[in-house]
Amino acid sequence: MAFLKKSLFLVLFLGLVSLSMCEEEKRENEVEEEQEDDEQSELRRSLRSSIKDMAAAAGRAALNAVNGIVNPGEQ
């Protein structure tokens, strides 16, 4: 009977250790996914900012070109 108790405790202990390791791995994966999401968000934000800056520069250049055509002597 004592042998069965020891075996049962050993099985339960190993199961808990295995479960603990799985939970830890799951948490690590979630952290990695969050970091990837943060990096992607930051990349999108910087890309939007760059596009916005380029569009503003293109708009100013176009406005200056139109002003140069409409008012050739002024600048």
Curated annotation (Swiss-Prot):
Residues 23-45, 74-75 form a propeptide. It is found in: Secreted; Target cell membrane. This is Dermaseptin-SP5. The modification Proline amide is found at P72. Residues 1-22 form the signal peptide. Keywords: Amidation, Cleavage on pair of basic residues, Membrane, Secreted, Signal, Target cell membrane, Target membrane. Antimicrobial peptide with weak activity against Gram-positive and Gram-negative bacteria and fungi. Has been tested against E.coli (MIC=96.06-256 uM), S.aureus (MIC>192.12 uM), K.pneumoniae (MIC>189.00 uM) and C.albicans (MIC=384.24-1024 uM). Probably acts by disturbing membrane functions with its alpha-helical amphipathic structure. May penetrate bacterial membranes, but stay at the mammalian membrane surface. Does not show hemolytic activity. Does not interact at all with cardiolipin. Pfam families: DD_K (PF12121), FSAP_sig_propep (PF03032). Belongs to the frog skin active peptide (FSAP) family. Dermaseptin subfamily. The lineage of its organism: Eukaryota, Metazoa, Chordata, Craniata, Vertebrata. Residues 26-46 are annotated as: Disordered. Its main location: secreted. The keyword Repeat does not apply. GO terms for cellular component: extracellular region; membrane; other organism cell membrane. It comes from Agalychnis spurrelli. Residues 30-40 have a biased composition (Acidic residues). Expressed by the skin glands.
